[in-house]
Amino acid sequence: MAFIKLLRKTKDEPSRLAKAVRHLQVTLDDPHATYRPRDVLFGQVLLDLKQNVANVRVRLTFIGEVKSKYGTAHKRGGCFMEKSTVLYGDDGDLDTDEMEPTVNGLTKGVHKFPFSIRVPSGKKIHSSIKFERGSVSYHLMAVFESVVEPEGVSAKVRTKVNILVPIDVYRYSDVVVKTILLNSNAKSKSHKINSNDHNGHLNGDVTTLTTSDGSSEGTKKTISESQIINNLSQRQVLQKSKSEGSKSESIQASTGQINQLPETSSQVSYNAVLTNGMNRDADNQTVKIDVRLPHSGFVQGEYIPLTINVSHYREYYHPAGVIATLVRVCKVASGRKEDTKEIYRKDICQSISPLLIESNKLENTISTYLKVPNDIIASMTSLPEHFTFQYFVEVVINLSRKLEIYSHSQKPLSYILEKQKTKKPLTIPRDLKELNLPASVNENGAWEVPRPSLNNEKSNGGIDSSRNDFQSKFGSAFNKSTLFGLKNIDEIHVAEQTIIFDDMVDVERLKRMRNVAGLSIETIIGNKRSSPAIDLAKLEISKLSQGKVMKSNGTSKNTSSSGSIESNSIVRYRYISFEQDTQSSTDSYDEDITKMGNQLNEWLSPANAYEEYYPVPEYSANENVFASEDKQELEYKRLHELESDPPQF
């Protein structure tokens, strides 16, 4: 009987708790904020009970979920992160006997449980995203359950949390240059093959691949013409990828990760020969294409400047000779044993430039721009079992005479070029347009408007107010990191005019034409660009070592007896230390660090500065500032000081 009674109690416990809950809610102090790893979430769990309950527990769980959709019906996903804590009650289960003990309880009414939980960090944390084929989401789940029967959850609620994992693109700061050489089929003797076909069709193919170490490999195949076309379509152009300061070179097909051309594509009339730039023969009729990127990593909202150099063996012109496209490639995995993936390509933006090769130069350098949108998804390759996001800058060189170029909506080339010309101009801020103030980028990288002279001021609040308004509105948007060398409004206007974001040229269709070559460069799209840390101690050593030279030129600033330096001189010393070679000063760093003593500024470094630590300022507590106490506590003290009522008899 005792066992049946206990069983009846455990079965009725979840239903009884479910009826006792009137409302359960999780609220964050800042619900619309975007949190990063190691940030602290502050909030509270609100529980409204209809009646008294005993042996209960309130649990808070931080959950990370991923979902993906392969094909039309195959959906999969799961929880890749789950960290929980108990806000009320015991974490363990309760061992019950015949007489059920009471370990805790909550009375009828509203109960608030404040919490603070730190966002996890590491490789298992990913940014929150949502797109057509999947999502990564985070939630805070509050659960009200019984200690006696933990599986019987009476109430639970979720609230969404936005997580942004910083992707620093500073380590992708090397210059990227890719070069391809295109040899003419008709003039190149190395590609001529004797054929027994009476119709004059090409029955053989020889491809010479020269790598950076000077070795070459030649292959000869006797196959049909359709097989040659299929072979050439799959390896249209071989790319050479090199980065300044890097010793490794990678060789891949220009359409290796982006394009999967069909077998019926036309034959390109240029066979690609990858070369290291040293064995190019000037007598050969070749076309050389160089594409240069100043960085391989860019932040959302930045411009991507491209420098494209085309060397031709004869004069040539095409109104759409160079087409640069920022491409996003999403790969969705199936999760099956065969490891099949669906590839989705999306053109983000595009720039069309004319190609003009004059007879006297036989080469042309084109400078064009692409722009990374602010709301774009950052690069993600940390979830290959579900989906990945990669970005490429694809440059297509149109060497054909045909103007059969169409957009995705089947609009001709004339419509695309006319739309590019009639694009709305960039809105110039009022400070630059009406007041005609020259804007520039200062040494700190900020977009600023110089302060006008007092003679031009009409009133005390006229130009100053508009200048401050410009600084507050556009100072963070237009900075040196975003512009990448665009230091005036004219260059920004040109960059904006050449970029197309909708109804772009169908590059996949264009590359199926004859005499069209293309290459792609993988780029990293992030959301952060950190600057290198400046060692202030080395900066001061460099300044002290150059002090005699500056005094001899009469450019030194007078300092006070305490060693303080004006702010203008600090900026000048910093500029000089960047421009001049500081190798000699850094080599003697170990010797000079012990001789500095009191020569450094007191605000810049403590007296016992160590070599491995950056100098930090010292602060003392302000004894004149008192923190105000709680109003209820002050009211309690005030009432306590009053005289008490006389006792009543």
UniProtKB/Swiss-Prot annotation:
GO MF entries: protein-macromolecule adaptor activity; ubiquitin protein ligase binding
Gene Ontology CC annotations of this record: cytoplasmic side of plasma membrane; cytosol
UniProt region (Disordered), positions on chain: 187-225, 239-262, 446-466
Domain of life per record: Eukaryota
Transmembrane annotation, as ranges: none
A single BP term in Gene Ontology: cellular response to amino acid stimulus
Comp. bias regions, Polar residues: 205-217, 251-262, 453-466
Main function: Required for the proteolytic cleavage of the transcription factor RIM101 in response to alkaline ambient pH.
Family membership: Belongs to the arrestin family. PalF/RIM8 subfamily.
Protein name in the entry: pH-response regulator protein palF/RIM8
The organism of origin for this protein: Candida glabrata (strain ATCC 2001 / BCRC 20586 / JCM 3761 / NBRC 0622 / NRRL Y-65 / CBS 138)
The organism's taxonomic lineage, starting at the top: Eukaryota, Fungi, Dikarya, Ascomycota, Saccharomycotina
